Amino acid sequence: MQADPIVKSVMIVLALASLACWTIIIEKLLRFRMIRRQTHAFETAARNGERLTAEASNLAGRIVAAGYGAWRDQDPSESRMERRERIERAMRLALSYDMRHLQTGLPFLATVGSAAPFIGLLGTVWGIMNSFSAIAASQDTSLSVVAPGIAEALFATAIGLVAAIPAVIAYNKLTTDLGRLQQSFIGGIMMLGDHLARDRNHYLRAEAAE
């Protein structure tokens, strides 16, 4: 393709942006799928009052570790409600940290989704202007002269749309999925916090057994 250097640069930038978007999309889909399983196990165990494993290798484990850490730091003078709020606050902070990490890459999808069509349009406008300049210089308005330049220019817009459409769809889906995961974890946190604050002896025996 003998496109103008600027048009060609626009196409390359959009192609690289599209590749980066698909890399983020695939990584996030696989990551969220794994975390969804952790969420289900976390909610089930918290609902049933089972002791959870505080593993630093996964999100649920880090939340549990934060909860157990707050539970161990007990103040005899605090009420059950105060103890529950303190334990839940520690787990929510751990969740918030991981949620921020999971959001990495999503702003890039949003940026590509909103900017790529306009970047492609810029390449198209620039290419059409050059095509008209070439037509004026050659004094030849035949289709064989006009069509290639305009087709190359329009191709920049097409690449922009190809990059933007999946990015927008993925951003909306991943944002929704992330919100649902967060709400599921919050539900588990509330149940676990209640169990830890209410039944201290049960968890104390579990700690001693380990």
Region annotations inferred by a language model:
Residues 2-47, 55:
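Transmembrane alpha-helix/interfacial motif
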Residues 33-142, 169-210:
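Predominantly long cytosolic amphipathic alpha-helical stalk/bundle segments
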Residues 21-28, 163-174:
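Transmembrane alpha-helical segments in integral membrane proteins
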Residues 153-167:
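Hydrophobic alpha-helical transmembrane segments of polytopic membrane proteins
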Residues 10-13, 17-20, 116-119, 123-126, ...:
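Residue-level signal for the membrane-embedded core of alpha-helical transmembrane segments
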Residues 139, 143-153:
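Hydrophobic alpha-helical transmembrane segments and adjacent short intramembrane/lumenal linkers
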Residues 4, 22, 55, 64, ...:
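Residue-level signature of catalytic and energy-coupling elements of molecular machines
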Residues 12-13, 147, 155, 159:
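Alpha-helical transmembrane segments of multi-pass inner-membrane proteins
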